[in-house]
Amino acid sequence: MKTELSQKLFEKANDLFPGGVNSPVRAFKGVGGTPRFISRAKGSHIFDVDGNDYVDYVLSWGPMIVGHCHPEVMREVQDAMKEGSSFGAPSPREILLAELVRERMPWVEKMRFVSSGTEATTSAIRVARGFTGRDDIVKFDGCYHGAGDPLLVKAGSGVETLGLPDSPGVPADVARHTLTAPYNDLPALEQVFQAKGASIAAVILEPVVGNMGVLVPRPGFLQGVHDLCRKHGALFIVDEVMTGFRLSSGGACGLYGLRPDLVTFGKVIGAGLPVGAFGGRRDVMDRVAPAGPIYQAGTLSGNPMAMAAGHAALKLMTEAAYRKLEALSAALAEGLQAAAAEAKVPVQVNRVGSMLTVFFSDRPVFDAASARACNTRRFGAFFHAMLEHGAYLPPSQFEAAFLSTAHTDDDVARTVAAARLAFAEAAKVA
């Protein structure tokens, strides 16, 4: 496989950007080697500058649920662009997308569009603190909620790959207001509430963890977190930046029957354009400026092209589309598990809907500690062999892979065939 142009571009990029990239996980630090520079994408495939063709399971880290360059999405975005790329004023497209969100998630009684998932989560935290008059928040070890200072405490994803439990530059006075507990461990969360309940403004969680690899909630865990929040007067914030409109038309909240006080969105809601949102209970959201005193603002919030992209993508995600995604994802997970068994490589294939992770472990992976115990060297060998055979997976053991409605049975078959060869390579690594 040719990589000469990617290598040359990476050399130039290292002179221009920290680590040669504009987001850490893209640098292949977790697996080694040279990141591929992508020139174009179509459907379920991406193509690099050297002409290599890959079945894409990164999908821009989740947003491309209908695949790349879907004609309906492209048409609606092009129509919006002809009208103007940004107004700094309200537009009808904001209402079209918001009404579609609330139709599918009626618990989102009011919402605010922002420009990223990080902006959504940090805004939700501010709103929770302002609404409750409390300062502390609780997050779960290994859950990643964006790059805001209050949430870079025991975060997963790229922070995990770098081996940093926290990021330098986060003041201790900020971090001390972020309490943590192990994911899937209700007794541990109860202890946190017993110790600090009167000062806790909110608990924020990924309902299905995606930034430690896919961690599946144990039965009763999510509802238990909700109930503890109710008992102690804290807000229950569900971070659906990754899961929203991906796991079902109602996201993870719809799938698991949750009713959050606040919910955050990103990724799918913008179909690949920069966008985020937070929303929830009417009485909570009515405290947000200009209706209330809790300040939040953004120059590009509600950008018309992002609104158009999200609206087009969500309209395409019918119940039939979700059924197709489930069938394809189940077939891929089963094929990967079988290929690993053939190679006698112990793995755990964790999956919820169209999110999955192959963990190189002989034990169940259900929290940050069990994820960190995985064999990242074997994952690195597996990743590079898959890349060589045309399957583009997330370049980290601690990330989720995604499928789209553009993926086909042939894509899955090609990927499983590549996995048979890749697991054989991984078996050679101790």
UniProtKB/Swiss-Prot annotation:
Q: Which domain of life is it from?
A: Bacteria
The record's section on SUPFAM superfamilies has:
PLP-dependent transferases (SSF53383)
Q: Which Gene3D superfamilies match?
A: Aspartate Aminotransferase, domain 1, Type I PLP-dependent aspartate aminotransferase-like (Major domain)
Its Enzyme Commission number(s) read: 5.4.3.8
| Coiled-coil portions | none
Gene Ontology terms for molecular function? glutamate-1-semialdehyde 2,1-aminomutase activity; pyridoxal phosphate binding; transaminase activity
InterPro entries linked to this entry: 4pyrrol_synth_GluAld_NH2Trfase, Aminotrans_3, Aminotrans_3_PPA_site, PyrdxlP-dep_Trfase, PyrdxlP-dep_Trfase_major, PyrdxlP-dep_Trfase_small
What residue intervals traverse the membrane?
A: none
**Assigned keywords, A-Z:** Cytoplasm, Isomerase, Porphyrin biosynthesis, Pyridoxal phosphate
Signal sequence residues = none
- GO cellular component terms attached to this protein's record: cytoplasm
Cofactor(s) this protein cannot do without: pyridoxal 5'-phosphate
The kind of enzyme this is, by top-level EC class, is isomerase
One GO BP on record is: protoporphyrinogen IX biosynthetic process
Pathway info: Porphyrin-containing compound metabolism; protoporphyrin-IX biosynthesis; 5-aminolevulinate from L-glutamyl-tRNA(Glu): step 2/2
Q: Which reaction does it catalyse?
A: (S)-4-amino-5-oxopentanoate = 5-aminolevulinate
Which residues are recorded with the post-translational modification N6-(pyridoxal phosphate)lysine?
A: 267
Compartments annotated for it: namely:
Cytoplasm
By its UniProt entry, which HAMAP family does this protein fall under? HemL_aminotrans_3
Q: How does it assemble?
A: Homodimer.
Q: Which PANTHER family match?
A: GLUTAMATE-1-SEMIALDEHYDE 2,1-AMINOMUTASE, GLUTAMATE-1-SEMIALDEHYDE 2,1-AMINOMUTASE 1, CHLOROPLASTIC-RELATED
Membership in a protein family: Belongs to the class-III pyridoxal-phosphate-dependent aminotransferase family. HemL subfamily.
- The name under which this protein is listed is Glutamate-1-semialdehyde 2,1-aminomutase
